[in-house]
Structure formats: structure tokens, C-alpha cells
Amino acid sequence: MTKKLALKRKGKDAEPTNEVVASSEASENEEEEEDLLQAVKDPGEDSTDDEGIDQEYHSDSSEELQFESDEEGNYLGRKQSSSAEEDEESSDEDDDEEEGSSDEEGEEDEEKDSKSKQADDKPSSSGAASKKAPTTELSKRDTSKPEYQDSDTSDEEDIRNTVGNIPMHWYDEYKHIGYDWDAKKIIKPPQGDQIDEFLRKIEDPDFWRTVKDPLTGQDVRLTDEDIALIKRIVSGRIPNKDHEEYEPWIEWFTSEVEKMPIKNVPDHKRSFLPSVSEKKRVSRMVHALKMGWMKTTEEVEREKQAKRGPKFYMLWETDTSREHMRRIHDPVSAPKRDLPGHAESYNPPPEYLFDAKETKEWLKLKDEPHKRKLHFMPQKFKSLREVPAYSRYLRERFLRCLDLYLCPRAKRVKLNIDAEYLIPKLPSPRDLQPFPTVESMVYRGHTDLVRSVSVEPKGEYLVSGSDDKTVKIWEIATGRCIRTIETDEVVRCVAWCPNPKLSIIAVATGNRLLLVNPKVGDKVLVKKTDDLLAEAPSQDVIESERIKTAVQWSNAEADEQEKGVRVVITHFKPIRQVTWHGRGDYLATVMPEGANRSALIHQLSKRRSQIPFSKSKGLIQFVLFHPVKPCFFVATQHNIRIYDLVKQELVKKLLTNSKWISGMSIHPKGDNLLVSTYDKKMLWFDLDLSTKPYQTMRLHRNAVRSVAFHLRYPLFASGSDDQAVIVSHGMVYNDLLQNPLIVPLKKLQTHEKRDEFGVLDVNWHPVQPWIFSTGADSTIRLYT
């Protein structure tokens, strides 16, 4: 009986998930015993090739085997003699059950005992020679058995370490890693260094499928079924490959709601007739109301409220204060009108009367009467009887009445704030040099308004366009006019190509855009430009009729060729502005009268034109190319739209809150935009911050015609009809958290006024901190 119990315990320790059922025949038992003993191999037979051998792990709870580490850190297996008392106690419990066993079963048990002892002695002799960490292979569950046959639930597995669900790093400082079922310490397996880990990676073919059990510290070799299960989970499939995911649906219960009456008996005739008992009750209630015996619901509620008495009562105040509470709390009296001053007298002093300039300014603000200092114009009469009736009397009385009953009244506490506290602290202009301060040269030669000016990329020459139908090319250093090109109509805009490898000037005159070779500077560039513009490339794309009717490319005639004109681009409406792309191959033109074809983009190398917009969203006034990104800025009268030319979509819409936009200039880095308006304002937009202006500058007294950023220095300038050019410092920092620094530096006012026009255009020198300005006085002025 003792031998049978020992064999059962050995079988459970070696194969926890498989059971060996003994048969009646001795031959079959011997074959099964040999199969069970094949799992235990002698590692001492070949100590060099034992890396891939699977070993079994036994905790200290085993009655037959106990693992202890030797001096080298290896595990040694030894037999433990089971105590006779435990065997007797266990045998006494099973004596009654085993009495009917045959003698053949006893002989078979003895054979099993002898073979199991031999199998246990083999690993004990060779355990000291092995220096690898013990590796266990995950047991294969017999799929033919039910899932919960061996135990109640899957959570109650054969867990040898009983520490529970705790962090295992708590045992890092101890030699053991936990306790088994008998509260005995589980000694940690030997831990190799990095060299051993590296050798295992190279020599062990199953290293990739070996994982460490955190509870026991043993290396566990994953079986093929485990790897297949992991692959199915990683690939997002159902772990059980035998599960049919799309098996046919069996509708055990119908999904349609069937409505059936509980009873289908026809209604009785009396269910349609009024109740006689209710009729009698109602008649009695009516009679009681007439006789006064019964009261209505409202009368009953009134009697209840009268019995209860007042719900709230005055605790401290008397009933006389109720009238005061009904009135408006702290009424605010209407503000009185200002008393008339000396200007409203019928015979005011002469200094209160308007002169011609003040009268003109007062009449100019007819559409904005709230901006006038006085709502009337002072007049002088000899006597009081000559004063006529006041024509605005009824209107002023009416507005006063509206103010009295429509405008809310409130008491405001007047804040006494020092004016110096509100003024921002700006650096001194002396610390922000260099910037232009004086007028150095005046270029004279035009006979009418000079509308546009542009500088060569190297900064040696200057081109200007005027209303006298001429284009002049100047030498900047000497002020000498090198060449004059006459045109048929007024020159609205000129722009020098920013590509230093080409020498091309775009001239907008009337409906034509002229591409001119100025024939100045390097002769190699002049010849290269002529070769580029000599022949038209072959057209690979068929242009639509919409583009053909809007623009036409042609070579210049012989007389224009002598002047330097090489290509003529004829538009269907007058051109107002022309601008180049940074690379010099594309240029855009603006025709405010062109409706949905107001803006055109031309490609010089292919002689092809494009209409970027199919619909008009306002009168286009100005366009610009982004210096870095493929973006296109379009300014209408009130707003600015930014389009992505690659994606062909609207990126952002900037709100200027102005009446009419006159010009734009973009910072060389492309993150800030400067806008000029005809209502005396300059708007600074931070494109990364908001769609509203970061700062609004009112530095001019009249309309601002033009603004420009310097390409190298942190400077920008503006020109206005007040004959002034204001130079300002505009530093943009690389730190996105720091706002731009804007400081007005110098006001340059040397132009003369002609027909209410002042400075029409400003442009910076590409290298030096110099600025050019054109004015209505037919001059071009250089400030350095």
C-alpha cells in the first residue's frame, strides 16, 4: 500500500496534467512505464550537448526529491526517505479500498517503484556537471479531456510558489524566491552574467522560444501550441483555431414581435353607454353646489391659506418700508447736457471760427460725424436778431430722448492711471542702428507721377515706371539714367526678376505685360536672358478657351525689340500690379476689373498661364507669393486669403477690419505679414498666432500707399499721402514664445504734395539699409 501511494505521488509530480491508467495486463503497464520514463534523460551521458534537454522542476514539497544548490550554484537531486509514520497513516486510510487488489497489481507496483528509483538516480549524478539554468517545457494539455476535469477551475492550477500576486522584485535581496505548499523556501536558480546570456543566444537553438517564469525564476520553453496561440493573438485572430467564427445562425427564438390580444371577446353594449351610478353622483354634487352645501376647490384652498396665516413676516423692519422696496434701487439720474461754450455763441471770438483748412477737414468727415470735434460749424452774426432758426433742433431733441430711455445708466469709478504706465518701454533708436536717417540722392527725369520702383537683385541698378508712359533704368551709385523705354500707356507697376541669374524686368502698362531685357550689368547674363526669351517652347498642354480669351503670349515686334522688349503678354483688362515668385520662373498679375479672372499666374519657362480661381470673392487688390512655402496671398478690399497652390485649397482667412487694402509685404521668413490700408493704418499679422492683426499701427495722417520689408535687416517702411516715409524696426525672433518687437525709428518727409498724392511706393535696397521712395512730385529719393 505504501508503494502504491509513492508511485501515485511520483506520477503527479512528473506529469501534473496527464494520468496513467493501469490496465490489467502486465505487458501494457510495462510499455506505459517506459513511455513515462522517457521524459527523464541522463544528462551525465554527454555533458557537452545537454543544452536542449528538457528538465523538470520539483519544489521542496516533493516527498521523494529535494533540490539544493552546490558551491557552483547547480541543483542536485537526492532521495529523501519518507517517514514510516506518514506512510502508515496514509496506508491506514486506504487499507479498506486496497484489500480487494490482486497479487498481480502488487508485482506491477514493485516494477514501477524500481524503475522510478532508477530514473530519479540519474539526474542526481550528473546535476553537478551541468552549469546551465534549468529549463522546463510547458506541459501539453490533453485536448481529449474536458477542460476542468483535473480541478474545479482554471485558476486553481498547480502553482508551486505560493507567494501570491505580489511584485517579485521584493525577493531581489534574498536567496530564495518564495515558498512552496509546505512553507519551505524555493531557492533561486543560478543567474548567469552577460557572457552566459550571449553564449545561450548563440548555442541554444530554443533560446528564442524560452521565457522566464517570474514566480519560480525558471526558464520555460514554449511549445509549438503556445507559439501558434501567440501568433494567432498577435495577428488579431481567435485564439482557438477549432472555433468556427462564422457558423450558421440558428434562430432559436423568433426576432419578430407577435402581438396577440389576451382576450378576443366582443365589447358589451353597456360599455358604450354612460354609467348610471356616475350620473346620479354628478347630479347630487350639482345640487349640493347650488344649495351651498359643497364648496369648490378654490374656496377650500383659500380657507386653508387663511387658517395657516402669513408664511413670511418682517423680522427687524416695519411695514412702512414696503413702499420703498417697490421703487427702483438706487436710481441714477440722467446726465445733464454740457453747457454751451464760446464756440456756440452768435458772436464768437475770431480764434473759434474755422479757417479754410479746418472747414475742409470738417466737411471731409461727413460720413463719420462722430469723429468731428464739434457737431456744428461756428458762425458769427452782428446781432442776435440776425441769428436764423436752428435747423438741427428737432433732431437733437429726438436723439436726447433716445439717450434718456434707451441707454442704460451706470455709475463708473474713475481710475486714476498714470499715462507713463500705459506707454510700453521700447529700446532707444540709437541701439537699433543701422537704419536710413537722411536723404542722400534725388533721381529726377520723369515728368509725371512715379508709381512704382524696383531694385536689381545685386543692388546696382534701379528701374522706375511713371504716368509719363516711360520706364527708366538708373544707376544707383551715380544717379545717372542709363536707359529710357517708352510705352504706349501709363506704367502702373514694374518688378525686377529676383533670380540673379536672369536679367528681366516685368512692366505692366495698360493691358500688356512687357518682359524687358534692360541690357545692363553682366553681358553673359544679358545674352543668356535673350536666349531664354528668344524661342517659345512647345506646348504640351492644350489651353482652355477661358485662358485664351484672358491672356495671350507673343514675341515683341521689331521696334520694341530694339528697346529691349522680348515678350508681350496681352491681358483682357488693365493690369494694376505684377509680382515675381522667389525663384524667378513664375509671376502673377492683378486686374481688378477682371471679375473671377482678376488674378493670373504666368510661367516664364513654358510660356503658359493659369487662372487659379473660378469664382470671385471680392475685388482683388494685391497678390503675393510666399517666400518659402507654395502659398499664394490674395488681398481683396477687406480680407486676405491664403491658398495652398499644391493642395488647391484655402488655408487661412485674415480679418483686417479695414475699409480698403492698398498693399502687402511678407517677412523673408514667411511667418509675418504687413498690410497697408487707405484708412491710415498698418496691420501686422502673425500667421502662427491668429487671423486677427497682432498690432495695428496708426503712424500716418493720410492713406498708406505702400509697405515693404527689408530682406536682410529687421526693418520695414511705409509710404503715405502725407509725404512721409516712416522707417520702423521689426525684429522677429526664432523663439515662438517671444512676440515680435516693433519700434518706430525715423520719419523721412522730403517729398512734395501734388493733387492730394504723396509717396506712392517704397522699396528697400537688397543689401544695404537704404530705402527708395517714389512720389507724386515726379522724383525718386534715396534715404541712407
UniProtKB/Swiss-Prot annotation:
Q: Which organism is it from?
A: Drosophila yakuba
What ranges cover the WD repeats? 445-486, 488-526, 570-612, 615-653, 656-695, 699-738, 754-784
Q: What does this protein do?
A: Required for maturation of ribosomal RNAs and formation of the large ribosomal subunit.
- Enumerate composition-biased segments (Basic and acidic residues): 112-123, 138-148
Region (Disordered) location:
1-159
Q: Taxonomic lineage of this organism?
A: Eukaryota, Metazoa, Ecdysozoa, Arthropoda, Hexapoda
The record, for Gene3D superfamilies, names: YVTN repeat-like/Quinoprotein amine dehydrogenase
The Low complexity compositionally biased stretches are 124-133
Q: Write out the annotated subcellular location.
A: Nucleus, Nucleolus; Nucleus, Nucleoplasm
- Protein name in UniProt: Ribosome biogenesis protein BOP1 homolog
Task: Specify the superkingdom.
Answer: Eukaryota
Its GO CC terms are: nucleoplasm; PeBoW complex; preribosome, large subunit precursor
Q: Which Pfam families match?
A: BOP1NT (PF08145), WD40 (PF00400)
Where composition is biased (Basic residues), the residues are 1-11
Q: Which UniProt keywords apply?
A: Nucleus, Repeat, Ribosome biogenesis, rRNA processing, WD repeat
The processes (GO biological process) annotated in the record are: maturation of 5.8S rRNA from tricistronic rRNA transcript (SSU-rRNA, 5.8S rRNA, LSU-rRNA); maturation of LSU-rRNA from tricistronic rRNA transcript (SSU-rRNA, 5.8S rRNA, LSU-rRNA); regulation of hemocyte proliferation
Q: What family classification does the UniProt entry report for this protein?
A: Belongs to the WD repeat BOP1/ERB1 family.
Principal subcellular localization? nucleus
Q: Which GO terms of the molecular function aspect are on file?
A: ribonucleoprotein complex binding
Q: Where is the composition biased (Acidic residues)?
A: 27-36, 45-54, 62-73, 84-111, 149-158
